[in-house]
Amino acid sequence: MLMPKRVKYRREHRGKMRGRAKGGTEVHFGEFGLQALEASWITNRQIEAARIAMTRYMKRGGKVWIKIFPSKPYTAKPLEVRMGSGKGAPEGWVAVVKPGKIMFEISGVSEEVAREALRLASHKLPIKCKFVKREEVGGDSNESN
């Protein structure tokens, strides 16, 4: 499971999930990616389930990059506890994902295999996602004059 090695504070505010992702909106490492279309918290267990679904479908071929990291702790109070008396104990870790963020990247496999692997991974996540390809930078062929 992904989680920080150590943190300065054990508890954080929930925060707002307004706007679109600032960075990480393009495919950089791989050839294909899975892009978020909604804002949500993605838990470390959901990230791991999506990773396993992708790697099993690809038969351990190709390479997978996980572009999100669960660095935000979420807390929960025990069942049947009255209100008040402080914030609950840390329960797990989440990654804050906003629309436009590339969550996973794949390379080393065909487009059909990558599309199906990322589709299987998207079923493990609580948000709508879409398959994206790497945008090739134009102008390389004309500069060889």
UniProtKB/Swiss-Prot annotation:
PROSITE patterns: RIBOSOMAL_L16_1, RIBOSOMAL_L16_2. Keywords: Ribonucleoprotein, Ribosomal protein, RNA-binding, rRNA-binding, tRNA-binding. GO terms for cellular component: cytosolic large ribosomal subunit. The keyword Protease does not apply. InterPro entries: Ribosomal_uL16, Ribosomal_uL16_bact-type, Ribosomal_uL16_CS, Ribosomal_uL16_dom, Ribosomal_uL16_sf. Coiled coil: none annotated. One of its GO terms (molecular function) is tRNA binding. One of its GO terms (biological process) is translation. It comes from the Bacteria. The keyword Hydrolase does not apply. Part of the 50S ribosomal subunit. Belongs to the universal ribosomal protein uL16 family. Binds 23S rRNA and is also seen to make contacts with the A and possibly P site tRNAs. This is Large ribosomal subunit protein uL16. It comes from Shouchella clausii (strain KSM-K16). The gene is rplP.
